[in-house]
């Protein structure tokens, strides 16, 4: 080889190595490989294998590819100056990959839980562990994805998911400052009787307390988000330990449904935004690499067939995760390759996830009663480019950089009342309809509710009215097929079908009238979507503004 050519080759090699070092999976550890569904044959695809293990990766904290990750510069580094992490992985793939359809179907975990069994496969098991530890023929439900030949992948992204029930998590580093874990004053909202049991004496905090000195903390309570906060006297509560508080005298229970808030000095925050990079880099590895640094084969490439396309699916928190993933530019990997060609976000409304923030709390979600003052709904909302007068910003969820996925978003009636779903197709002021890009579709699955799935009954649970038992499953399955054809064949799905201002089907909540029905509780109004207030240092001057002067809201 002539010297100029050799020099050029070496330079290109150096660039490739540098690019690979920015963000990548370094090790795949396979813990178990076993037949899935007791060896059942799914049509022409045949039987499936169940693969579990751990993926380890590393990130360059100074790479432009990772610059959007909050506090990554504060994470400990290895000898190469890289930030390390690891995530649980779970794969269901055709035993003979050549008989699969070449599509990787990545489901984003919801608080560490798998959900496609209930959302797509009509699995009616009541215990989360039943679908989280999918093994048997019953766990395959109707077999929809398997009969179509998908390779299904899950991986952890949240380091603080509840343990047990076979949940999947992530090992992420703690943010450090001056050689010690970062510490800040944070606001913790506490409510029992809905998302957590009311029969508890002590409640767990999202982060350990840097100090359990009550003189440096404050606990308040109110019945509703719109009520003024009432301070709980210091002698009426205490830190049970660094990670929990309880009321005094001992044995006193928190009032169910009431909103308690604790302002305290917290510490040991994980660098949560790494979870997004872990998804990006794992799927990129499974699509494009043959083996890890130790020579362990890519479990999707070792037997032939391989992955030609990748799509992602998520419902509720997981759907918001996908919207946030797009906004952060995570669909472009370190080698400038697209990660997912298609995405499907269900019941995400207009929100994202409180997960790329200092002292973030990914499990928070803005609903009718609680978690109103945490980051979830921030501009941009729509894939269409528009102006937000509240923030003074212009923009769109899509980045327009050539790496945006084909996107399908579906919502139910719940998300229009509680999650700002109209903001996907109207401007932030709610004044006009938007024209969405050709690569974006939005649908309302009318007559269904946020947690709709097969096997629901109408018992009210924590709600005032009976639960809507209607399942959106048939519509979701049809749209999965539509996304598949869009990605693989270029066949576009039907046009978006949503309420619109121009047609008079999208109206102010105050204009929606329903006659009184005996025994039926009617909503007092819409769940207004406003910009998030501060949750750290201090508790937020705008919190006081909201209580005394009102707050601007999105249309």
Predicted regions and their residues:
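Bacterial N-terminal signal peptides
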Residues: 7-16
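Positively charged n-region of N-terminal signal peptides that target proteins for export
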Residues: 1-7
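N-terminal signal peptide c-region/cleavage motif recognized by signal peptidases
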Residues: 18-20
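C-terminal His-loop and adjacent cap/lid subdomain of alpha/beta-hydrolase
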Residues: 24-555
